[in-house]
C-alpha cells in the first residue's frame, strides 16, 4: 500500500498547489480494488506538516486498518461512491471558491464552451439539498447517497464531478491524480461560467454538436486528441 499512499499524498499536496483549498478544507482518496482498501487524507492535518505515512488506510466499511490518525470526516461519502461506481479510482472533495459558489446557489455549472466540453459531457449537476433527517443522521453517508441519486446509472467518468447543494464540489477520476486534474478543471470552468453569464445573462448552452465533438475527440471510442 506504500505506493498508493504516496500517490494519495502527492494528490492531496496538489490541492493547495493549484489553489483549491484553504487551510485543511479538502481531501483526496484512492482505492485498491483488488484488496478492497481505500487510502485517504487524515482529518484536520495541515498540508504543511503532512507526510505520505500520515495517509490513512480503511476497508470498505470504513474501519481503519493502517494509520495513526482518524481518516477524513468525508470518508463515508468517498466509500459510498466507490461502492456504487466501479470505474472510479480516485475521489476529491474541496471547497474551491467558484465551484462552491455554484453549489451554494443551488445551480448546475452550465456547459457554455469547449473548455467545459473537453472534460464534462453536459452540465456539471447540482444535487438536491439534504433533509434535516439526512443531515442529523449519517450525514456523510447520505451525502454520497444524494450524489448517487443525482448521477443515477450514468457513467461517472463522462461527467467527473458534481456540486452538492449548499456544500461544495466533488470530483473523481481513474486514479487520485486524474481526480485532482478534474477538480482543477471544474473550478476553472465554474469561474468561466460565472464570468460569461455576468457578461451575457442570456447566454445559452454550448451547441450540442460542438460539445459532442470536443468530448468525443478526447474520450470517445475513436478519440484522437493527444499522443498514443
UniProtKB/Swiss-Prot annotation:
The active site is at residues 118, 225. The keyword Isomerase applies. Binds 1 zinc ion per subunit. One of its GO terms (molecular function) is aldehyde-lyase activity. Pfam families: Aldolase_II. One of its GO terms (biological process) is L-ascorbic acid catabolic process. Induction: Induced by L-ascorbate. Repressed by UlaR. It catalyses: L-ribulose 5-phosphate = D-xylulose 5-phosphate. Its cofactor is Zn(2+). Keywords: Carbohydrate metabolism, Isomerase, Metal-binding, Zinc. It comes from the Bacteria. Its EC number is 5.1.3.4. Substrate binds at residues 26-27, 43-44, 72-73. Belongs to the aldolase class II family. AraD/FucA subfamily. This is Putative L-ribulose-5-phosphate 4-epimerase UlaF.
Amino acid at each position: 500500500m506504500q505506493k498508493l499512499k504516496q500517490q494519495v499524498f502527492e494528490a492531496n499536496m496538489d490541492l493547495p498547489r493549484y489553489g483549491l483549498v484553504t487551510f485543511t478544507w479538502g481531501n483526496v482518496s484512492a482505492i485498491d480494488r483488488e484488496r478492497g482498501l481505500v487510502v485517504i487524507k487524515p482529518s484536520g492535518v495541515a498540508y504543511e506538516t503532512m507526510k505520505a505515512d500520515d495517509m490513512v488506510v480503511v476497508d470498505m466499511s470504513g474501519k481503519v486498518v493502517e494509520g495513526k490518525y482518524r481518516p477524513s470526516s468525508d470518508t463515508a461519502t468517498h466509500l459510498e461512491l466507490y461502492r456504487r461506481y466501479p470505474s472510479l479510482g480516485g475521489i476529491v472533495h474541496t471547497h474551491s471558491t467558484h465551484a462552491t459558489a455554484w453549489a451554494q446557489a443551488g445551480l448546475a455549472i452550465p456547459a457554455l464552451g469547449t473548455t467545459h466540453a473537453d472534460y464534462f459531457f453536459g452540465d456539471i449537476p447540482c444535487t438536491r439539498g439534504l433533509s434535516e433527517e439526512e443531515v442529523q443522521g449519517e450525514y456523510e453517508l447520505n451525502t454520497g447517497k444524494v450524489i448517487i441519486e443525482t448521477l443515477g446509472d450514468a457513467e461517472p467518468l463522462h461527467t467527473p464531478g458534481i456540486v452538492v447543494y449548499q456544500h461544495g464540489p466533488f470530483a473523481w477520476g481513474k486514479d487520485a491524480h486524474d481526480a485532482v486534474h478534474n477538480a482543477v478543471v471544474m473550478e476553472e470552468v465554474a469561474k468561466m461560467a460565472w464570468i460569461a453569464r455576468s457578461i451575457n445573462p442570456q447566454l445559452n448552452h454550448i451547441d450540442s454538436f460542438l460539445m459532442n465533438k470536443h468530448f468525443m475527440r478526447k474520450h470517445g471510442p475513436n478519440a484522437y486528441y493527444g499522443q498514443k
